[in-house]
């Protein structure tokens, strides 16, 4: 098995067939809806909130609302659907979450997307939750995760998952690999590659995205959608406290299993960091789209499919030319 990560890979260009990158189409059909970009902000408290979720839905971007305000989920679904927008929520696997799914079914509240969101998703509890959702609200598109192996993908798909999230602890604020010794940190792109060989349904690459070029690489190695945390954090519109350090503006960014999210020191697999303020989120999305259009033009195509077949080379840590500043 070839082991590599994002910074080890460079994609090889093909002959360009477009006059301008603006001809390149970055849209993706994912579940029942079509979106402008194959990216989704991480469902974390410092990345996504209700106001941003509404803006993303209004502008044809995919989002997943986090699950850390459980009581707000039903009002959120009602508000989104009453506004003519799609609802995309997260659930865990505790007993109360199974009851929550039954309550949605009783109230005939059917979110278009439900993400089962736990750190180690290749588990009986996730499989049981997939089956529970499909039994009670079969019309919801179920995303399950996270996994890091082909076996995990197969089992979740066989249980009824419509898409699977791949990535165990490669994110910037995730310390799973340090706390537990397990994870896909350092080989996330290779893990995505081997998982894609087993997948029959869409995969979401989750974690380890440091540059816009990593989005194109994720698609090359099997992702339909790319989940991004730190690159989406610390914008004007982002949740999180703004602080000034040495005359510069920063926003806090922490992991979903950190003590800052959990409010306790036990079973912590995330940390907090401060990310320099990045300005407008709309500008970042526009730049992401333009960079991805350029990627498609280098791939010799006009849409995302062209990225899936390009050749690549493994050149260890070459992408920064030895200069990480």
Swiss-Prot record:
Record Gene3D superfamilies: Aldolase class I
GO biological process, alphabetically ordered: purine nucleotide metabolic process
Keyword NADP: yes
Reaction catalysis annotation: IMP + NH4(+) + NADP(+) = GMP + NADPH + 2 H(+)
Pfam family for this entry, one: IMPDH
SMART domains per the UniProt record, alphabetical: IMPDH
Class in the EC hierarchy, top level: oxidoreductase
PROSITE patterns (UniProt xref): IMP_DH_GMP_RED
UniProt signal peptide: none
Enzyme active site: 174 (thioimidate intermediate)
Annotated positions binding NADP(+): 203-226
Signal is among the record's keywords: no
GO cellular component: cytosol; GMP reductase complex
MF annotations from Gene Ontology: GMP reductase activity
UniProt cross-references to InterPro entries, sorted A to Z: Aldolase_TIM (IPR013785), GMP_reductase (IPR050139), GuaC_type_2 (IPR005994), IMP_DH/GMP_Rdtase_CS (IPR015875), IMP_DH_GMPRt (IPR001093)
Keywords, sorted A to Z: NADP, Oxidoreductase
This enzyme's EC code(s): 1.7.1.7
NCBIfam families: GMP_reduct_2 (TIGR01306), PRK05458.1 (NF003966)
Function: Catalyzes the irreversible NADPH-dependent deamination of GMP to IMP. It functions in the conversion of nucleobase, nucleoside and nucleotide derivatives of G to A nucleotides, and in maintaining the intracellular balance of A and G nucleotides.
Similarity remark: Belongs to the IMPDH/GMPR family. GuaC type 2 subfamily.
Entry protein name: GMP reductase
Species of provenance: Staphylococcus aureus (strain JH9)
